[in-house]
C-alpha cells in the first residue's frame, strides 16, 4: 500500500476528493462496485442472515455497539431480536426485492423463499446474503445504495455491516481451513 503525503493545499484537496475510498466504490469503467464485502465479512453476513437467528436485548446491543443511530424502540418492544431487525437498523431506506444466486436452483416459491432478498423502506424482511447480493454488477445492494443515497451512505453501510458481522462471528462457531492457522515466515520471525 502506498502512502501519499500532500505537499501543498492543492494536493491535499486533490487527495481528499479523488483518492477518498468512498468516492472510489463504483468503477467508472463498467458502473459496478469494486469495493465490497469479502472473506470474513461475507461469511459473517451469510451466516448472520439465516432465517432463525435470534438474540436477546443484551446481545443485540452488543452487536450494534459501534452503530450510532440505533432505533431503540425496535429493541425495547421485543424480547427476541432477529438478525433481520438488526440489519434493518443499518439499512438506508431502500426498497428492493430480488432472488440471490441460489434462488433459481432452489425450486422455492418466490414470495416465501429465504433465497429472495426483500427490503422495504429500509426494513430487512427476508433473504440470505451472499456474494452476488453485494456485488452483482450494476444491480448489487452496494451499487443501489450508492446510486440512491450517495457514496458516504454506501461506505457507512459496509462499515456498519462489517462491524456487526465481526461481533457476531466472535460469538458464533464456524470452521476455518488449516491454511488460516499456519503463520507465514515473516510472522514466525516476529514471534
Task: Go through each PLM region and give its residues.
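Feature marking long nucleic-acid-engaging regions of large polymerase/nuclease enzymes
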Residues: 1-191
Amino acid at each position: 500500500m502506498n502512502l501519499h503525503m500532500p505537499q501543498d493545499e492543492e494536493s491535499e484537496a486533490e487527495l481528499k476528493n479523488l483518492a477518498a475510498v468512498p468516492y472510489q466504490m463504483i468503477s467508472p469503467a463498467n458502473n459496478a462496485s469494486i469495493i465490497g464485502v469479502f472473506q470474513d465479512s461475507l461469511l459473517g453476513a451469510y451466516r448472520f442472515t439465516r432465517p432463525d437467528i435470534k438474540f436477546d436485548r443484551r446481545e443485540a446491543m452488543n452487536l450494534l455497539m459501534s452503530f450510532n443511530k440505533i432505533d431503540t424502540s425496535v429493541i425495547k418492544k421485543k424480547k427476541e431480536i432477529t438478525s433481520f431487525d438488526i440489519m434493518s437498523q443499518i439499512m438506508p431506506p431502500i426498497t428492493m426485492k430480488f432472488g440471490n444466486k441460489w434462488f433459481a436452483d432452489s425450486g422455492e416459491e418466490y414470495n416465501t423463499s429465504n433465497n429472495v432478498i426483500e427490503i422495504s423502506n429500509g426494513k430487512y424482511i427476508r433473504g440470505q446474503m451472499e456474494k452476488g447480493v453485494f456485488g452483482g454488477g450494476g444491480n448489487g445492494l452496494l451499487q443501489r445504495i450508492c446510486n440512491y443515497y450517495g457514496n458516504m451512505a454506501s461506505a457507512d453501510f459496509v462499515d456498519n455491516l462489517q462491524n456487526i458481522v465481526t461481533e457476531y462471528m466472535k460469538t458464533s462457531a464456524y470452521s476455518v481451513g488449516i491454511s488460516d492457522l499456519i503463520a507465514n515466515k515473516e510472522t514466525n520471525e516476529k514471534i
